[in-house]
Swiss-Prot record:
PANTHER family referenced in this protein's UniProt entry, alphabetically: TR-TYPE G DOMAIN-CONTAINING PROTEIN, TRANSLATION INITIATION FACTOR IF-2-RELATED
Residue ranges with Basic and acidic residues bias: 92-209, 259-272
Region described as G5: spans on this chain: 526-528
Region annotation G4: where it falls in the sequence: 490-493
Family: Belongs to the TRAFAC class translation factor GTPase superfamily. Classic translation factor GTPase family. IF-2 subfamily.
GO MF term list: GTP binding; GTPase activity; guanosine tetraphosphate binding; translation initiation factor activity
Ranges annotated as biased composition (Basic residues): 244-258
Chain's role: One of the essential components for the initiation of protein synthesis. Protects formylmethionyl-tRNA from spontaneous hydrolysis and promotes its binding to the 30S ribosomal subunits. Also involved in the hydrolysis of GTP during the formation of the 70S ribosomal complex.
Bias-annotated ranges (Polar residues): 67-81
Protein name from the UniProt record: Translation initiation factor IF-2
GO cellular component, one term: cytosol
Disordered: annotated segments: 28-294
Record domain tr-type G: where: 381-550
Amino acid sequence: MTDVTIKTLAAERQTSVERLVQQFADAGIRKSADDSVSAQEKQTLIDHLNQKNSGPDKLTLQRKTRSTLNIPGTGGKSKSVQIEVRKKRTFVKRDPQEAERLAAEEQARREAEESAKREAQQKAEREAAEQAKREAAEQAKREAAEKDKVSNQQDDMTKNAQAEKARREQEAAELKRKAEEEARRKLEEEARRVAEEARRMAEENKWTDNAEPTEDSSDYHVTTSQHARQAEDESDREVEGGRGRGRNAKAARPKKGNKHAESKADREEARAAVRGGKGGKRKGSSLQQGFQKPAQVVNRDVVIGETITVGELANKMAVKGSQVIKAMMKLGAMATINQVIDQETAQLVAEEMGHKVILRRENELEEAVMSDRDTGAAAEPRAPVVTIMGHVDHGKTSLLDYIRSTKVASGEAGGITQHIGAYHVETENGMITFLDTPGHAAFTSMRARGAQATDIVVLVVAADDGVMPQTIEAIQHAKAAQVPVVVAVNKIDKPEADPDRVKNELSQYGILPEEWGGESQFVHVSAKAGTGIDELLDAILLQAEVLELKAVRKGMASGAVIESFLDKGRGPVATVLVREGTLHKGDIVLCGFEYGRVRAMRNELGQEVLEAGPSIPVEILGLSGVPAAGDEVTVVRDEKKAREVALYRQGKFREVKLARQQKSKLENMFANMTEGEVHEVNIVLKADVQGSVEAISDSLLKLSTDEVKVKIIGSGVGGITETDATLAAASNAILVGFNVRADASARKVIEAESLDLRYYSVIYNLIDEVKAAMSGMLSPELKQQIIGLAEVRDVFKSPKFGAIAGCMVTEGVVKRHNPIRVLRDNVVIYEGELESLRRFKDDVNEVRNGMECGIGVKNYNDVRTGDVIEVFEIIEIQRTIA
């Protein structure tokens, strides 16, 4: 086509030259009126004009839908609501050039996918070939080694080797085939994933082009997070692909719970698709916790103290309390979640549930305080501690009284010792410390305590009485403490004394005299005349010299509480026997559950002393409370730490006591069922010293029977106070004072409440009166006593009473309205009541032996001749406590 000028073209288009020049300028072509126009320029102008004159690039359709909704209202009326739904949709006309560009991009993307697919396939084939080659090389190497190893047995193994080789080649081929299949499957999955991503990206680009500008700006962070997750997924795949050899085949295999098998974006898309609606479009991912429930039980290290509650044990093992209770029930123990159990039980339960137990020592503070003591190094000889034991009234206190040249026995109630007396005596050959123990049965614990704190036991046996029960008990205590025994045969001055009998009786219990080849010294003494006292002291010192008794004299003291009581003016008082070290006034002592500073010390004569060495008994003042007899006394440095240790011991004692109280034991079930049928004697006991409280409590508790039980409601050391009287009134108890009295306020309460208050100074009287009170609570014993026998001689019929037996009274007396038994051939066939008794048609109340009478038995007519009617009565016999 030839070129035309602007003027010619303007004439053809029927427009002015100026307008055509302006249109060329708008199309980007500068022309004047005389210039020529080429065909290409003309086409450019036509395209420009078509685009300018064409319709709009964007078409928006709006649609409105109106409807009416009836809503039920109050009072049964319905309400109409007008609803208008507006929908808006925009269509965009694409530019041909833009369409060509998108088509080119789509083509490039497909080519990239094909290229990636080919590369992945080639890579998988190379890896499979290398894997097969490596396995074949290793197989060949193993075969060569086996061939060298079995060269001497080639003939026998040729067939097996060929079969093995064929099998291995087959396995290698199978492995290669599996590797290729895995690679192919991975390649297909990768291709599907790439295609899915491309499709999703195309959809996103499409909707991104159509979206409003405000929406683009609001989705900026979403798009950024998507790209970040895609980059993270890509890096994860690269890391997984580079780890180890032959991991590609394993990675292609889908695993349960594999979090990296698909990208995070895919997982979020799946969750959004499930939700649906507008929420289906992902707006961003929240932080998610990847916690998984443990698949197996976690075994823990459980630290257990000396006591622990069931709930605390469950928390340490990270299980529910009900599981611990079930485990304890399987082991045969019933417990509640707040019950305190001991360390051994907790260890068994924890080990039963599969945990490792670590036992913790809770007395570290106590050990630290005990170790921080200044004890001397040099041990020096010390005086022996001698305990005088024997049966009651065998002369123990009188013997010691003669040694001390004082009258101690006159001060004891009833002439019997009821406390442990501690005295030290200076002799010509040295000093001796004596402990005088009670002899009667109630003071077993005091006697055992004396044996534990002693070096030598002097066993006093009366020559006229011989070996008695408390003598045997004293021998057992001495043997248990492994203490040598010196026998003092007392009352040798009496005419009926028989020392040889004492030797024979003691030999039955392992106490042999030296002249018989034994180890015990026998000394004949008389506490009344003073015979043999010097020989006894020499025997004691000789035995002490054999024992080589030594103790550290310097340093902090330690010892034992022999006796303790509460003095109204001085407070808690403890009799302490020092074992080693020197006890000074002002020392800080730790004594069982109590502690304090020694404010004063007195010897057995009541004199103030400033210090006491080994084997010296003293009374100390200043403790926080009355200690238990037998407690260890230790001097410590720090009063604050001593207080902490004392409080810790109190708490531990309480916890252990609670742990041992099994409220739901099966063996107590029947006892609890019959508890309402048992009478109780409640007692509030107060005594002057701790040892007497123990002895009386034990003796009273031993009096309990199946029908009457003794219950010690409260006990203590010191006088009877208003609190004790109030406790006795509340529990309906008997107030018992042993060598103590009630104060004025307590007496007012006792008079107002009319309480039973009893004072005693001898334990025998106390026990006898409690026995009498218990006997009054016993139900009387019913006894049947036969009072007469009557033999049936004949039987008559009476219209009023039926069969009447004509009888002869053969024994005793037959009384009217008494219970009877009918005996036939000495076998009881009926038991009932005698209804009618007549003699010569007259009603009588009784018929004596040898007389005839008529007897009518109530509700019984089968009386025969020859039967015997036995008449008896029931009497009540009051029982007593043995």
